[in-house]
Each structure stands twice: as C-alpha cells, then as structure tokens.
Amino acid sequence: MDNLRRKEKILIADDESSIRRILETRLSIIGYEVLTAPDGRSALFLFHKEHPNLVVLDVMMPKIDGYGVCQEIRKESDIPIIMLTALGDVTDRITGLELGADDYVVKPFSPKELEARIRCVLRRVDKFYFSNTFTNSGIINIGFLKIDINRKQVYKNEERIRLTGMEFNLLELLISNSGEPLSRTTILEEVWGYTPERHLDTRVVDVHISRLRAKLEDDPSNPELILTSRGTGYLFQRIMEINKNYNPIIQIQKI
C-alpha cells in the first residue's frame, strides 16, 4: 500500500453496527483511515469536520437518510459517493445515482466487493485530479461548450458547469471517441474500472449519461451532443457535425 493511499479517509455511514465494524476493520487493514457514522446527521457532521476522500452511504438511516446526505454533500463537494442499496429495490439504486452518487453496491454484499469498488472509484478520481500533468492537452471548443482539459472544467455558453470527477471522465471518454458508439459495458470498464456482473450494473452508466445531458444539452429530452446508439450504448456526436450548427468552428488552443 503506497503512502498516498494510506492518507485517504473513508467515511462509512450505516445504521447497522455490524456492517460499520466489519468495514472499519477491513478497510483499516488495507491502509485507509476509516470514519464511521450511525446516522445521516452524524455523517454530515463528520463530512464537514474530517473532509473524507470518499463517502459510503446506506440509503436507510435514521435522522437523515442516505439520499438527504448525498444531496447535502453534492451542494458543496464532488467527492466520490457510493450508495449501499437494498437487493430488490431498483428505485433505491437509480435515485441515489440521480442525486449525484458515483456508484452503488447492493446489500447483502461481500466486503471484498465494496473494497474493489472503493479502489476503482478512487483510482478514477486520481486520474481526474492528476492527469493535468500532460502537456499536450488544451481547450476544446465544441459548439456552445468549452472544455478545459488541463483544469478539468466545462463551460456552456461561457458559464461554468460543475461536473463530478466521474462525469468529466465519462464526457472525456465520449469526446475522445466522438462519432463512435460505445457499449455500456465498455463505458463501465473504462470509466468505473470494473466489468458488469449483472445487467442492472450498467444502469449506473444510463443515469450518469442522463446527468450529463441535463447539465450540457439545451434540451435533454432531445439531445444533440450525447446520442443513444440503439442496440449498442451511447456516442458523442461527430464534432464536425456539431460545429456545422454552431459558430465558431472547433479550435484547440494550447495552454
């Protein structure tokens, strides 16, 4: 375990003491600093006091449920959030993602599965924050969007659009393959770092696509940038096609 990883704090919020105890023990052994909270109010207190690197939220918690905690965190931070959801409730999973969670794990779960998801999400976030060391990236203008690759920022009609690390990584993947359909499985593997074991695993992709459309498209119900490829997955419209309808044409400016 490297020194950087050992400094990372994980906040576990779950009202089941056995789950908190098991996860605290296992995650501590592999080098994380672990904080635990038995309810949503305590989770928010620890979030503001300790500034964790990643938060794991159970949906059903007293005082403030996982949805409420997720909403409050997203008002001020884009740190990774993983939801713990009930096995039979698809609504729990989708709602959490729509509120800004990056991923979910279904209860009952193997601690090893959650450990793997935590590693994957943190690795992707590391890529988001540290990939600005590349010198051959710059600013890309696509229609009404300006994408600053170095600073990992997106502007729509000159107004800053706030994206989470996962959302930016997803957008970057789509743009780098513009005009090429990408399957949900491919997107999940490239952005989240794991292969789906169940069909429902790919719903995380659908919800993040929906979130990107809501933030970037003029009319999310009739998208012009991020298109659905029937029977395949999604694709980002060919950049030259986009710029036929917008002015100025695409420019790449070195920083």
UniProtKB/Swiss-Prot annotation:
Protein's name according to its UniProt entry: Probable transcriptional regulator ycf27
4-aspartylphosphate sites (modified residues): 58
GO molecular function, one term: phosphorelay response regulator activity
NCBIfam families for the chain: ResRegRpaBCyano
UniProt xrefs under InterPro entries: CheY-like_superfamily, OmpR/PhoB-type_DNA-bd, Sig_transdc_resp-reg_C-effctor, Sig_transdc_resp-reg_receiver, WalR-like, WH-like_DNA-bd_sf
SUPFAM superfamilies: C-terminal effector domain of the bipartite response regulators (SSF46894), CheY-like (SSF52172)
Compartments (UniProt record): Plastid, Chloroplast
Note: Although originally identified as Cyanidium caldarium, these sequences derive from Galdieria sulphuraria.
Name of the encoding gene: ycf27
A GO biological process held by the record: regulation of DNA-templated transcription
SMART domains assigned to the protein according to its UniProt record, in alphabetical order: REC, Trans_reg_C
Coiled coil: none
Keywords, alphabetical: Chloroplast, DNA-binding, Phosphoprotein, Plastid, Transcription, Transcription regulation, Two-component regulatory system
Organism: Galdieria sulphuraria
Boundaries of every Response regulatory domain copy: 9-122
Keyword rRNA processing among UniProt keywords: no
Protein's UniProt keywords contain Chloroplast: yes
